[in-house]
Design a protein with these regions (language model features):
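A short glycine-rich, Lys/Arg-flanked "PGG" loop and its adjoining helix->strand segment in the class I
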Residues: 85-100
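Conserved class I S-adenosyl-L-methionine
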Residues: 100-129
């Protein structure tokens, strides 16, 4: 598994604990340091399944041979890339035939939802005309449209196999709101999972999870 932009390693470590061989490709040296510390705290068997490389997800060809991975994850990264197509193509190149490319992106088709539901009408109106937005960190980033990414995936030989909505109901929750306790948490996750695979709800989710499969 290649995890591009693993951040603090929540996803990468979970996969390594499940027995997968995981390579993390991270551009931010601060995040690399945090992730190295997290890996060092794991048992030896898990540490042996983790490999960390400091590098840019747009330059996968400089680090890996074509067909090196069965799964490539790129979650929460494309919004920071001005032009996603070259990066997505590079990710697909390092996939083995039949391999899975998993993308998690901001949904440009629902970009007006959060500001609109919050009563921020100027931002909501602007979101209809531009995929650019300011995220919760105060950074200028961009969103992607599902149809556009689906066309990109088809063009690079990893056509879209399935897609889901993420954060249909919970996107307005503030970052400092405590995680619900059981049994509410289980009900919340069940509602999000159901909405994320059901029309029309998934189309207005804050994020899109797109799964492409590399042709043989």
């Amino acid at each position: 598994v290649l995890d591009v932009g693993p951040g603090q390693g929540t996803q990468a470590l979970r996969l390594a604990r499940l027995g997968h061989e995981v390579t993390g490709l991270e551009l931010d040296p601060r995040m690399i340091a945090v992730l190295r510390e997290a890996v060092a705290a794991e048992p030896e068997g898990i540490r042996e399944r983790m490999r960390l490389i400091e590098g840019d997800g747009r330059d996968t060809g400089a680090h890996f041979q074509p067909g090196s991975f069965d799964v490539v994850l790129c979650h929460g990264v494309l919004m920071y890339v001005p032009e996603p197509d070259p990066m997505v193509a590079g990710l697909a190149r390092v996939l083995a035939p039949g391999g899975l490319l998993s993308l998690l992106v901001r949904n440009a088709d629902a970009l007006a939802m959060r500001p609109g539901l919050s009563g921020d009408w100027d931002t909501a109106l602007a979101a209809f005309d531009s995929p650019a937005y300011t995220n919760r960190l105060g950074l200028q980033v961009r969103a992607d449209r599902r149809e556009t990414l689906a066309a990109t995936l088809a063009g690079i030989g990893a056509p879209l196999r399935a897609w889901y909505g993420v954060r249909v109901f919970t996107d307005l929750a503030e970052d400092d709101v405590p995680v619900p306790t059981e049994p509410e948490l289980t009900r919340l996750l069940a509602a999000e999972e159901r909405a994320g695979r059901t029309d029309p709800y998934r189309a207005v989710a804050a994020l899109l999870h797109l799964c492409g499969v590399r042709g043989g």
